[in-house]
Amino acid sequence: MTTSNRILLGVNIDHVATLRQARGTRYPDPVKAALDAEEAGADGITVHLREDRRHIQERDVLLLKDVLQTRMNFEMGVTEEMMAFAERIRPAHICLVPETRQELTTEGGLDVAGQEARIKAAVERLSKIGSEVSLFIDADERQIEASKRVGAPAIELHTGRYADAQTPSEVAEELQRIVDGVAVGLAQGLIVNAGHGLHYHNVEAVAAIKGINELNIGHALVAHALFVGFKGAVAEMKALILAAAAKA
């Protein structure tokens, strides 16, 4: 957990794999994207191995585990298949996320409060392999407190509602929800990360929230990389969030 206003950038490379899978080719290579991201200042690499394998594949994860210089944040659904795979690869960080086949992207946070026994068992099992387990949840006090009860050392607050807000009042309301969620998480002794839907025009307000440890960002980076290259996209984002955090 950071003790200053310095904030970490986790780069999600899922959508590099999305582009590859669209044509069933061997390119673009998400592993190369990860290495480029590290060179440009990424503090970690996030990948989500979905049940439907729509983007990242097992081979990608295995290769990344061998070559990353930073650390892997492995996003996964709470299924026996994924639990067994995580035990095999032993990533530094694991983030448990909700997952349905029909969704375009992760649509909301994990309902920890509604399934505490199941999530607690998963956290305990994954902690035994040495992984730091976080839970991807909405910035809701009930879910944050439940995350503490099940033994997770970290949470990732879902910023999608903030990213999707249309009017200034909606943006302010959703940003305040995140601010409050960070405060509750820190009061519970949790490491607080955040992510989902963040891009170059909305990230600074979130990066300026004191106490956030890491922001995980993917789609916006991959999209911007079409015009400036992946290293350039990551470097720009890193500069934005560090500047915003320094001003806070």
UniProtKB/Swiss-Prot annotation:
Annotated catalysed reactions: 3-amino-2-oxopropyl phosphate + 1-deoxy-D-xylulose 5-phosphate = pyridoxine 5'-phosphate + phosphate + 2 H2O + H(+)
Source species: Pseudomonas fluorescens (strain ATCC BAA-477 / NRRL B-23932 / Pf-5)
Taxonomic path: Bacteria, Pseudomonadati, Pseudomonadota, Gammaproteobacteria, Pseudomonadales
Pathway in which this enzyme or protein is active: Cofactor biosynthesis; pyridoxine 5'-phosphate biosynthesis; pyridoxine 5'-phosphate from D-erythrose 4-phosphate: step 5/5
Residues annotated as site: Transition state stabilizer: 156
Enzyme nomenclature, EC number: 2.6.99.2
Binding site for 1-deoxy-D-xylulose 5-phosphate: 14-15, 50, 55, 105
Name by which UniProt lists this protein: Pyridoxine 5'-phosphate synthase
The protein's role, per its UniProt record: Catalyzes the complicated ring closure reaction between the two acyclic compounds 1-deoxy-D-xylulose-5-phosphate (DXP) and 3-amino-2-oxopropyl phosphate (1-amino-acetone-3-phosphate or AAP) to form pyridoxine 5'-phosphate (PNP) and inorganic phosphate.
Cytoplasm listed as a keyword: yes
HAMAP family referenced in this protein's UniProt entry, alphabetically: PdxJ
